[in-house]
């Protein structure tokens, strides 16, 4: 079938400023923009745009919007990116989700985000609905991508694991929420940044180990995050299937390991990039990674492609609309 993203759709309200105001202070910002967003939408858009045009698999978005102007614009954005929106529901009496994003231009485009979930709160599916979304009798491998901007992704992950064993579960636990150790083992491809990686370790391993890692990170950042990546792979991942851990380290680069190459590898970030807005960088990276792996590329090749794609995204404003096309990445490769 292809790649399905189950997640959030938000309308982004972006304010660009030199700095954030202090408590009780009114500060004049530089300018204001609106964009399509939500981690689910961003990842689906990235997958749609970074998919090789010669590939014939489908890209689907599963989620909900309100019956308002914001919702219509979000659905149009997905369609323009080549994403099937058949299962994007429209709810009456509830607004489309929104994200208020504050972007500090004098701090390298770093952002802070406030979410109002709106119609994303309705993205909950019972077994009957899941059977309709994922019909029986499909033998093709499918990737299903999750984040944590919807109420209960874990219940859907458990259903897929039990009922569609040929599916690969891709999980980006953002914003982070702790889960029992056994539930992390349901994931086939885990994609985290350094903060989320450390949060997982803190939630499932003993405090003494966590304190030791925290103490050493300041002196050996890369070495300690290698240890975290190893822990996530060796102690949590479902190695019966693909078994991949990818950890992004912002401007430093990416750590990754897999069942094919359990030793943690490091790819430095692309340097000398003019950073405008980092909002869509992580979602672009995930989109590129998933498309490349689904198309049969090696993990190393997929990481290189994704790193280049995200480096192009951060040179433009916005999230979904700032993401490059497959041909743009190939041109810069």
UniProtKB/Swiss-Prot annotation:
It catalyses: D-ribose + ATP = D-ribose 5-phosphate + ADP + H(+). Its main location: cytoplasm. Substrate binds at residues 10-12, 38-42, 149, 283. ATP binds at residues 193, 248-253, 282-283. It is an enzyme of class 2 (transferase). Present with 1780 molecules/cell in log phase SD medium. Catalyzes the phosphorylation of ribose at O-5 in a reaction requiring ATP and magnesium. The resulting D-ribose-5-phosphate can then be used either for sythesis of nucleotides, histidine, and tryptophan, or as a component of the pentose phosphate pathway. Homodimer. This is Ribokinase. It comes from Saccharomyces cerevisiae (strain ATCC 204508 / S288c). The lineage of its organism: Eukaryota, Fungi, Dikarya, Ascomycota, Saccharomycotina. The gene is RBK1.
């Amino acid at each position: 079938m292809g790649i399905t993203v189950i997640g959030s759709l938000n309308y982004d309200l972006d304010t660009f400023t030199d700095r954030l105001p202090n408590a009780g202070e009114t500060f004049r910002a530089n300018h204001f923009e609106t964009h399509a967003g939500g981690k689910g939408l961003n990842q689906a858009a990235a997958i749609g745009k970074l998919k090789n045009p010669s590939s014939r698999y489908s890209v689907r978005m599963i989620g909900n919007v309100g019956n308002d102007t914001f919702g219509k614009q979000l659905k149009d954005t997905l369609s323009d990116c080549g994403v099937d929106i058949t299962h994007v529901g429209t709810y009456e009496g509830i607004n489309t989700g929104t994200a208020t994003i504050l972007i500090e231009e004098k701090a390298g485009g770093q952002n802070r985000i406030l979410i109002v979930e709106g119609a994303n709160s309705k993205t909950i599916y019972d077994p009957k609905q899941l059977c309709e979304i994922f019909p029986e009798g499909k033998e093709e491998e499918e990737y299903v991508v999750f984040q944590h901007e919807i109420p209960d992704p874990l219940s859907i992950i458990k259903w897929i694991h039990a009922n569609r064993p040929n599916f690969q579960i891709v999980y980006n636990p953002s914003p982070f929420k702790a889960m029992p150790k056994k539930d992390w083992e349901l994931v086939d491809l885990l994609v985290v940044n350094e903060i989320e990686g450390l949060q997982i370790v803190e939630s499932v391993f003993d405090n003494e180990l966590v304190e030791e890692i925290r103490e050493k990170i300041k002196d050996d950042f890369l070495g300690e995050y290698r240890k975290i990546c190893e822990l996530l792979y060796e102690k949590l991942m479902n190695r019966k299937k693909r078994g991949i851990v990818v950890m992004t380290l912002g401007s430093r680069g990416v750590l990754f390991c897999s069942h094919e190459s359990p030793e943690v590898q490091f790819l430095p970030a692309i340097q000398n990039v003019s950073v405008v807005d980092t909002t869509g960088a992580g979602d672009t990276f995930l989109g590129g990674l998933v498309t490349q792996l689904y198309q049969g590329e090696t993990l190393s090749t997929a990481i290189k492609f994704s790193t280049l794609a995200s480096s192009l995204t951060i040179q433009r404003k916005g999230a979904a609309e700032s993401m490059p096309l497959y041909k743009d990445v190939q041109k810069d490769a």
